[in-house]
Design a protein with these regions (language model features):
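A late-sequence structural motif
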Residues: 123, 279-318
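A short LG(V/I)-centered, amphipathic sequence patch enriched
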Residues: 58-77
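Flexible hinge/capping segments at coil-to-helix
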Residues: 176-218
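Beta-alpha-beta core module
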Residues: 173, 177-185, 190, 250-298
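Short helix-boundary/capping micro-motifs
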Residues: 28-45
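Central regulatory/effector-binding core of bacterial HTH transcription factors
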Residues: 109-172, 246
């Protein structure tokens, strides 16, 4: 951070009401990691330095913020209050730092991105290329996670941006109540493809309807993808005969190539590796496409590095 911050608390907590925002980061890290040692490691500090910060904070507040339970520690009610407000406070201060840095002509920063697996070999390389060309000072760190976990990572301030998806009629949509209080924006669509063995009768059509595959054996994906397949086939008037389940895209194509069954995969997943010999793909109707989303904390776009990354993601997903 190019600037140092102090958060002034106006409530009557002890004789010295001032504590720095880094202490909030320490409290949040303890909540996430479950120990002072692990929190110190995650923040790049020594364990004694973190312990001293906690002691100074407790002296200023006049209440304990952690308590020991066996060999671990947990937050007290006061500590949980601080941890709950920490993400909003740090996001606002990061935004202020970014705006001030912009005034000084700086265009650098680190953005923590989390995205689903099929985005890793498709979207992420294009994003990095875009940023290297237009904003070489922006650094991206990246972790894979499916949408529910990715949304939670933003909520817990472990990520700045989550790249997620949802399906039409998705009853487990992570952008519903679980994203309450977060900013969710739709940025594109990812067509769903029928994955068929070479020579399949439906392969001669420009688009395939799910109802055309009602009599086939099916290969399903992860539990959430399986749920979507059941809904998709249910809307087409049949229950799929699922003989195999795997979330390994290569395995799906291998099974299809051997005539074991048919499957559906998002276009992004299919484009993440060469289509296997003996396999053909045909698009399903556009109405079955999954929607791609960017999820952030409210106000995160005021942080210049985050805004630049959001704009770049929007471009590469267009």
């Amino acid at each position: 951070m190019p600037l140092a911050y102090a958060l002034i608390m106006t409530d009557n907590f002890g004789d010295d009401p001032e504590f720095d925002v880094q202490t909030l980061r320490v409290i949040k890290a303890i909540a996430d990691e479950g120990s002072i040692t692990a929190a110190a490691t995650s923040l790049g500090y020594s364990q004694p330095a973190v312990s001293q910060q906690i002691k100074r904070l407790e002296k200023r507040l006049g209440v304990a913020v952690i308590e020991r339970v066996g060999r671990s520690v947990r937050l007290t009610e006061a500590g949980r209050v601080l941890a709950r407000h920490a993400p909003a406070v740090t996001t606002a201060l990061d935004a202020a730092a970014g705006e001030l840095a912009e005034l000084r002509g700086l265009r650098a920063g680190r953005v923590r991105l989390v995205g689903f697996p099929s985005a890793s070999p498709t979207v992420v390389p294009r994003l990095l290329t875009d940023l290297a060309e237009h904003h070489p000072g922006i650094t991206i760190t990246y972790v894979e996670a499916e949408p529910p976990e990715a949304v939670e990572a933003v909520r817990e301030d472990r990520a700045d941006i989550a790249l997620t998806f949802s399906y039409p009629g998705d009853r487990d949509d992570p952008h519903g109540s679980s994203a309450s209080g977060l900013a969710v924006r739709a940025v594109g669509a990812d067509d769903l493809l029928a994955v068929l063995p070479e020579g399949h009768p439906a392969g001669g059509r420009e688009r395939v309807r799910v109802a055309d595959l009602a009599d086939e054996n099916w290969i399903a994906g992860c539990p959430r993808c399986r749920g979507h397949l059941l809904e998709l086939c249910g809307r087409a008037g049949f229950e799929p005969k699922i003989g195999f389940e795997t979330d390994n895209f290569v395995a799906v194509e291998g099974l299809v190539a051997q005539g074991i069954g048919v499957a559906t995969l998002p276009r992004m997943a299919v484009e993440s590796f060469p289509v296997m010999p003996g396999v053909i793909t045909r698009p399903l109707p556009h109405a079955e496409a999954r929607t791609l989303h960017l999820v952030t904390a409210h106000g995160a776009e005021r942080v210049p590095a985050v805004r630049i990354a959001l704009d770049a993601l929007t471009r590469v997903l267009a």
